[in-house]
Amino acid sequence: MAGRSLGQAVATVSLSVALASVTVRSSACRAVPAPRNTFPTCGFHLNANIMSGSNGAKENSHNKARTSPYPGSKVERSQVPNEKVGWLVEWQDYNPVEYTAVSVLAGPQWADPQISESNFSPKFNEKDGHVERKSQNGLYEIENGRPRNPAGRTGLVGRGLLGRWGPNHAADPIITRWKRDESGNKITHPVSGKCILQFVAIKRKDCGEWAIPGGMVDPGEKISATLKREFGEEALNSLQKSSAEKREIEEKLHALFSQEHLVIYKGYVDDPRNTDNAWMETEAVNYHDETGETMDNLTLEAGDDAGKVKWVDISDQLKLYASHSQFIKLVAEKRDAHWSEDHAADSRGL
């Protein structure tokens, strides 16, 4: 999602390595037991890759964090070639653009002050009051009083749209069910022969891209509470419901979110909002409704930051926001669900 030198730390996101070490296969359409809080090694492999100091940059990594214009603005980042992403690569002429959005500088509750303010003394790499400033990827370096993005250069300094200096923690609930026919039978893909998994997707209002419903962890809030709250707000429009409706939604969500689940990913995210000094980290968790009965009793309704919400078939054709497609692929692999019509691609992983 302080001061020790990090290497290139390009977010190469070596999920193929993670998948090779943790993916559990089962026969097609057979329910896969989901032990609570599994998949820790997935986060380990990616975290180790980011923090390793490797000098090699892959063209398909750390891309969204270098895109221009910066979201919600006309600001163009300084261009960062693949071979110069990593901090270990010397680049004396590196001249990133400085940008922090007006909405952040206005000083809302969710945002830090400017580093230059005399009364602001953040405790980086540790819990700072109610604000979690520790990274899920390990220690990050501080340079000239500012945290340095562990994944490398982005062409932009400041915070952009992000409120916190350093890691900005989010939570992404991935709610899944099996696609079924009118008789209630699971539907298999005609090519792969595997059952088709569906997940709840929202269309973001800010950029129009489809995404996993999720959001920022409030100060002092537990991840489990964030996961449930964000799903209720964005996929069920709970903020606009009456007290009685909210209680009913809460009861049904409790049944779903208190069951066995899979922690799919924890750590840095290649996100278009990232800067050299502020970046997104997330914990993506899969809650699976095996029978479909729980979600059948909940009506999807877009709310808060979501413009639309719907069930989406999972496949490699999905085009999703930030790193969400990678998270969804991990879920498909773990559930032994359909992902690709290319059997070779299925066996290779990402």
UniProtKB/Swiss-Prot annotation:
Q: Where in the cell is it found?
A: Mitochondrion
GO terms of molecular function: ADP-ribose diphosphatase activity
Q: Which reaction does it catalyse?
A: ADP-D-ribose + H2O = D-ribose 5-phosphate + AMP + 2 H(+)
User: Could you say which enzyme class this protein belongs to?
Assistant: hydrolase
Q: Where is the transit peptide?
A: 1-46
Report the family membership: Belongs to the Nudix hydrolase family. NudF subfamily.
List the protein's name.
ADP-ribose pyrophosphatase, mitochondrial
Q: Which gene encodes it?
A: Nudt9
